[in-house]
């Protein structure tokens, strides 16, 4: 699936346990159609001890969210993204109100 989202974009989560939360995209996996949003969809991960002297630990980590479950969020407005050309330059804009990004 082709996406117009980029790393660092502010997005709103549309479904799941963090529905309605807003965060920035930390990474995008285009092959699996997943995004990781900072401080959202946190899961606990168990890290095993590597040596007998070292202890195992439990850490909180962001889990991937399907790209269809997020939408771009700018200045209180969430909308789909569009692309148009102005002066031979690709411009991303909000389809709801035409605002440039």
Swiss-Prot record:
Keywords: Ribonucleoprotein, Ribosomal protein, RNA-binding, rRNA-binding. PROSITE patterns: RIBOSOMAL_L24. Pfam families: KOW, ribosomal_L24. The keyword rRNA-binding applies. It comes from the Bacteria. The keyword RNA-binding applies. GO terms for cellular component: ribonucleoprotein complex; ribosome. One of its GO terms (biological process) is translation. GO terms for molecular function: rRNA binding; structural constituent of ribosome. Part of the 50S ribosomal subunit. Belongs to the universal ribosomal protein uL24 family. One of two assembly initiator proteins, it binds directly to the 5'-end of the 23S rRNA, where it nucleates assembly of the 50S subunit. NCBIfam families: rplX_bact. This is Large ribosomal subunit protein uL24. It comes from Borrelia garinii subsp. bavariensis (strain ATCC BAA-2496 / DSM 23469 / PBi). The lineage of its organism: Bacteria, Pseudomonadati, Spirochaetota, Spirochaetia, Spirochaetales.
